[in-house]
Amino acid sequence: MDRTLVQEILEVVEQAAIASAQLTGLGQKDEADAAAVEAMRKRMGTIQMQGRIVIGEGERDEAPMLYIGEEVGSGTGPGVDFAVDPCEGTNLCANSQRGSMAVLAASDRGGLFNAPDFYMNKLAAPPAAKGKVDIRKTPTENIKILSDCLGIAISDLTIVVMDRARHKNLVSEIRSTGARIQPISDGDVQAAIACGFEGTGTHCLMGIGAAPEGVISAAAMRALGGHFQGQLVYDPAIAQTSEWADYTKEGNIKRLNEMGITDIDKIYEANELASGENVAFAGSGITDGLLFDGVKFEKDCTRTSSLVISTLDQTARFTNTVHIKDGAQSISLK
């Protein structure tokens, strides 16, 4: 993986974001996702690489494109593994709400954890708290550590938690410390990454979300030097989701074992979820969010706002791109 490829993956997420954004607010979440998938797959196909999807839209028999194990790219060049979410926050996009984006993580072959389609308990925090907060500690303990590391009063800390019934006790404990809570309905990748930047108003992400998105968040936080830990959740009583209505704890453990995951309670650090020598993250806003704006359609151009983070040169680049239409007559400065 090289710097040229990092530029290419920026364009991949830009095209996916533009495709989804055309359906923003129309209540068509499946169509928005499909549009992003098709655009992402098409742009990936032009890149000189031997790409492979390790986290995607599902198993081969569940998804027509960007399925797990699918080969993407020209078929020549470096071997690259991808974890993709072409439209993270499909409900957000469908309802024109904040926080939807096209995202992916890339690494050298074998450098991304093949996360099962399970849930994951996550903890994300700023670089100053890396290795000091710990998912094994209670939320109260971690909030006190955050306050000390950041030099911020607990009452001024904001903790992001997904708005789910399973987080009732977590929310109650956080509130008991005096810290603030920002509930989100979907899209915890952007919230996790926001913890890595000062000035976002987001200081920590706690709670359970999707495991595949945890790998994407881990890749970004590793490149930023931030803190990220994840632990797979296999007990339906903890996940509290209708998606597991017919699943049992024992059945889920069996599924994990069949996938080669025998240490089912392992706590994964960012550099284990994204272990490659070279790791990159790319995200482009579909709707406005914590880190960047969504797609803006104008008469003669389309504007995208994106972020690329890479370990190759230890950079985080915020990029505003003007995609000029054929026959454009006038393009405003901003």
Swiss-Prot record:
Cofactors demanded by this protein: Mn(2+)
GO cellular component labels: cytosol
Catalytic activity, reaction form: beta-D-fructose 1,6-bisphosphate + H2O = beta-D-fructose 6-phosphate + phosphate; D-sedoheptulose 1,7-bisphosphate + H2O = D-sedoheptulose 7-phosphate + phosphate
GO terms assigned for molecular function: fructose 1,6-bisphosphate 1-phosphatase activity; metal ion binding; sedoheptulose-bisphosphatase activity
The keyword Protein biosynthesis is assigned to this record: no
Keyword Manganese attached: yes
Pathway where it operates: Carbohydrate biosynthesis; Calvin cycle
GO BP field: fructose 1,6-bisphosphate metabolic process; gluconeogenesis; glycerol metabolic process; reductive pentose-phosphate cycle
Pfam families for the chain: FBPase_glpX (PF03320)
Residues that, per the record, bind Mn(2+) 2: D85, E88, E213
SUPFAM superfamilies: Carbohydrate phosphatase (SSF56655)
Keywords: Calvin cycle, Carbohydrate metabolism, Hydrolase, Manganese, Metal-binding
Superkingdom classification of source: Bacteria
Gene3D superfamilies on file: 3.40.190.90, Fructose-1,6-Bisphosphatase, subunit A, domain 1 (3.30.540.10)
EC number: 3.1.3.11, 3.1.3.37
Binding of substrate, residues: E88, G89, T90, Y119, R164, A165, R166, D186, G187, D188
Family matches, as InterPro entries: FBPase_class-2/SBPase (IPR004464)
PANTHER family (alphabetical): FRUCTOSE-1,6-BISPHOSPHATASE 1 CLASS 2-RELATED, FRUCTOSE-1,6-BISPHOSPHATASE CLASS 2
Assembly with partners or alone: Homotetramer.
Record-linked NCBIfam families: glpX
Protein family according to the UniProt entry: Belongs to the FBPase class 2 family.
Described function: Catalyzes the hydrolysis of fructose 1,6-bisphosphate (Fru 1,6-P2) and sedoheptulose 1,7-bisphosphate (Sed 1,7-P2) to fructose 6-phosphate and sedoheptulose 7-phosphate, respectively.
Stated name of the protein: D-fructose 1,6-bisphosphatase class 2/sedoheptulose 1,7-bisphosphatase
Organism field: Prochlorococcus marinus (strain NATL2A)
Lineage: Bacteria, Bacillati, Cyanobacteriota, Cyanophyceae, Synechococcales
